[in-house]
């Protein structure tokens, strides 16, 4: 018997009835022979980790520009924290940890440079709009491996596509594992963005709303502990009641929504970051403008996309894949003179 089959048989014994069993995967767009020692979701996890898009996350901003300090989260650190939170919840619920890990590690592959500023600029540029979750799926299906894509399982792609959205009415993933990643993403970024904001001097601990802190906890570790345990126990209650969905309790969920709103009002859309936001927007807009008018200068992959799907699409794919550093260097290369000739 193959090692993979042993693992799949063990899943039948170990995992919750609502979990996604590896041997019941819907499969991939292109058929492949099963691996001898890894389940299909292990294979997906490994492909994501070894992808170029995953490596570039280390030089993409989460909220604060990386050059401001060594301890601010990058998009890669955020991704790893999401994976950790999601796996903790998933193991407690006896879900498929490998599926959770693959979705979590791949959920932001398509995120643009300069955090959500990049997403907003590309959304204005691309007809039909730009969303990082949709771009993450596109990266996995079409951009990676010079246009061949990673050929991930449909469960992983579904989890990546549906990881966004905060309200209970948002479209959710088709697997419990995907739903767990959706909550883990929010739990991770709300808490680490508070931590980074305090480090940057934008917030003080005393600025956090007292009524929310009394419910969720005063420190980041306390809040994560509260949210993770509430998610686990409330989801178990849902399953026992015949309502198979991942969710927070009303009290914790309402407090969490209020805390997220506080972050939007005071950090993401606050005045402190306004000047830096304008600079990043300017750099992105000028790089986009240049390549829209000179798309023949882009690498072969993106030139081919321009010819097949239009210049807007090809330029969007190229710029969306840029790191903060690469985008800034492109701006300097295009617009800043290296020397002056008399």
UniProtKB/Swiss-Prot annotation:
Cleavable signal peptide: none
Domain of life: Bacteria
Pfam families the UniProt entry points to: HD, HD_assoc
CDD domains associated with the record: HDc (cd00077)
Isomerase in keyword set: no
Keywords associated with the record: Hydrolase
One GO MF term: triphosphoric monoester hydrolase activity
Ranges where the HD domain occurs: 75-190
Entry's family note: Belongs to the dGTPase family. Type 2 subfamily.
UniProt name for this protein: Deoxyguanosinetriphosphate triphosphohydrolase-like protein
Biological source species: Clostridium perfringens (strain 13 / Type A)
